[in-house]
C-alpha cells in the first residue's frame, strides 16, 4: 500500500459540477489499494476576487493589515475543502476537511508569503488508519502566535509537496487543466510537444522561469526529498501526463528541451546616495521579496532590480517609506518587461547555443537588457511586446521537440 498526495487546482474545482467529477479520480486511486491525501486550491477566480475586496478597504501597508489579508484570502481554500469532503461523502467515501491550524502546519510570521517550519502528521496518520481521506485546505499555515498565514501565490502546490515530504509519500500528483508539461506554451506554439518525463532540476528552472503549471517552491521540495511528482489533467484523468523525477543526463551536449516566458515581473529603478547597492538589495529581500536580477547602473547612485509583479504592493510601501525618510532620492516601477528562458542540460558550456541565440535576436532587432546563465538555463530580459515573437523564433531555431 502506497501513500499518494493528490492536489487539485482552481480550474479543477471551479464549480460544483467539477468538484463532483473529482470523486471518481480519488476513488480510482483508492481502488489501487493506495491511501490518498487531497490538497485543494480555491475555486478559479475566487482568490483574485478576495484580493480585490481587500484592496478596496485597505492600503495593505503594515503587518496587522497583511495578517487580516491572509484570513480573507485563505477562505477560498476552506470552502473548497469542505465542499469536496461533502461530495466524497455522497459517493460513500469517508472524507474530512482539515485546516492548517488543526494539524498544524506551522510557519514563520511573514504574512502573505510565509515559509513552513514544520508539519505535525499525527492527525493525518490517525484518519488514514480510519480509512478516511483527509482533504487539506492548501495555501495556508499558522504561526506561533496562532495567527493564520498564507504561503503566497501557488501556495497550494507548496502545501501538497510539503505534505508529501512530511508523510513520506510515494508520489505527489498535481491535477490541473492541462495534460502535462509542454516544450513551450501551446497558445504560442501550437505544435509544442508534451514532455513525458523531465528531470527535477530542469523542471525547477522551467517553473521558476514563468511556466505556470507548477510553482517552483513545490518542485524544489519534491526534488529535495526525492519524491516523484506527476502533472495530470483533471478533465482527461486517463491520459498520461508528465512525470517529474531523477533521470540520467549528458552534461556535455547542449540541447534545448523547452522554452518559457515570464511577464509577471517588475523592474525597480532606485536612486540613492546614502544607501549602497547591497543595502537597498537587502531591504528589498526582506519579507521574502524575491529578486530575479539586480544591477548597479551608476556607482552608489542608481540601482536596478527585477522582482515579481506580485510583490508590488509590499515594495511600493517599503520604497515610499525610504523616500520619505530621505534614504533614497527616488524610485520608479516598470512592468513592461519579460524574460525568455531556454531550458536544457549543458547549454552554458556549449558556446554555440548562446551564439545562435544572440545572432537570431540581433537579426530580429530584439533588444536584450540582461542575460543570465546557469548549467541548465539561459534567461533573456526583453521588452514584453517582443516575448511571443521571440519564443516562436527561438523555438523554431532550435527545433525543440
Curated annotation (Swiss-Prot):
One of its GO terms (molecular function) is aspartate kinase activity. It catalyses: L-aspartate + ATP = 4-phospho-L-aspartate + ADP. Pathway: Amino-acid biosynthesis; L-lysine biosynthesis via DAP pathway; (S)-tetrahydrodipicolinate from L-aspartate: step 1/4; Amino-acid biosynthesis; L-methionine biosynthesis via de novo pathway; L-homoserine from L-aspartate: step 1/3; Amino-acid biosynthesis; L-threonine biosynthesis; L-threonine from L-aspartate: step 1/5. One of its GO terms (biological process) is diaminopimelate biosynthetic process. It comes from the Bacteria. It is an enzyme of class 2 (transferase). PROSITE patterns: ASPARTOKINASE. GO terms for cellular component: cytosol. Keywords: Amino-acid biosynthesis, ATP-binding, Diaminopimelate biosynthesis, Kinase, Lysine biosynthesis, Nucleotide-binding, Transferase. Gene3D superfamilies: Acetylglutamate kinase-like, VC0802-like. Its EC number is 2.7.2.4. Belongs to the aspartokinase family. This is Aspartokinase. It comes from Rickettsia felis (strain ATCC VR-1525 / URRWXCal2).
Amino acid at each position: 500500500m502506497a501513500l499518494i498526495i493528490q492536489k487539485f487546482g482552481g480550474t479543477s474545482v471551479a464549480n460544483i459540477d467539477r468538484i463532483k467529477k473529482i470523486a471518481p479520480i480519488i476513488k480510482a486511486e483508492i481502488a489501487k489499494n493506495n491511501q490518498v491525501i487531497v490538497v485543494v486550491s480555491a475555486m478559479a477566480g475566487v482568490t483574485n476576487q478576495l484580493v480585490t475586496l481587500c484592496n478596496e478597504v485597505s492600503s495593505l501597508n503594515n503587518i496587522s493589515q497583511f495578517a487580516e489579508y491572509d484570513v480573507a484570502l485563505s477562505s477560498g481554500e476552506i470552502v473548497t475543502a469542505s465542499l469536496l469532503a461533502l461530495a466524497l461523502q455522497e459517493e460513500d467515501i469517508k472524507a474530512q476537511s482539515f485546516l492548517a491550524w488543526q494539524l498544524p502546519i506551522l510557519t514563520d510570521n511573514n504574512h502573505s508569503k510565509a515559509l513552513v517550519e514544520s508539519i505535525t502528521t499525527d492527525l493525518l496518520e490517525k484518519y488514514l488508519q480510519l480509512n478516511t481521506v483527509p482533504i487539506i485546505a492548501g495555501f495556508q499555515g499558522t504561526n506561533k502566535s496562532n495567527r493564520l498565514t498564507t504561503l503566497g501565490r501557488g501556495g497550494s502546490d507548496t502545501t501538497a509537496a510539503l505534505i508529501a515530504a512530511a508523510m513520506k509519500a510515494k508520489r505527489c500528483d498535481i491535477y490541473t487543466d492541462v495534460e502535462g508539461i509542454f516544450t513551450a506554451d501551446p497558445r504560442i506554439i501550437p505544435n509544442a510537444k508534451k514532455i513525458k518525463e523531465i528531470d527535477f532540476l530542469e523542471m525547477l528552472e522551467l517553473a521558476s522561469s514563468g511556466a505556470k503549471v507548477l510553482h517552483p517552491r513545490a518542485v524544489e521540495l519534491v526534488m529535495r526529498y526525492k519524491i516523484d511528482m506527476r502533472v495530470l489533467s483533471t478533465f482527461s484523468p486517463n491520459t498520461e501526463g508528465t512525470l517529474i523525477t531523477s533521470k540520467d543526463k549528458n552534461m556535455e551536449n547542449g540541447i534545448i528541451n523547452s522554452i518559457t516566458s515570464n511577464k509577471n515581473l517588475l523592474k525597480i529603478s532606485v536612486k540613492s546616495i546614502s544607501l549602497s547597492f547591497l543595502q537597498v538589495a537587502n531591504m528589498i529581500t526582506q519579507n521574502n521579496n524575491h529578486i530575479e536580477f539586480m544591477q548597479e547602473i551608476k556607482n552608489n547612485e542608481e540601482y536596478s532590480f527585477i522582482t515579481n509583479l506580485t510583490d508590488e504592493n509590499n515594495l511600493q510601501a517599503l520604497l515610499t517609506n525610504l523616500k520619505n525618510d530621505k534614504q533614497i532620492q527616488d524610485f520608479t516601477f516598470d512592468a513592461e518587461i519579460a524574460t525568455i528562458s531556454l531550458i536544457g542540460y549543458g547549454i552554458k558550456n556549449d558556446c554555440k547555443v548562446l551564439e545562435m541565440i544572440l545572432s537570431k535576436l540581433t537579426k530580429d532587432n530584439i533588444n536584450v537588457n540582461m542575460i543570465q546563465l546557469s548549467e541548465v538555463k539561459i534567461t533573456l530580459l526583453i521588452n514584453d511586446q517582443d516575448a511571443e515573437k521571440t519564443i516562436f523564433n527561438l523555438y523554431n531555431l532550435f527545433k525543440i521537440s
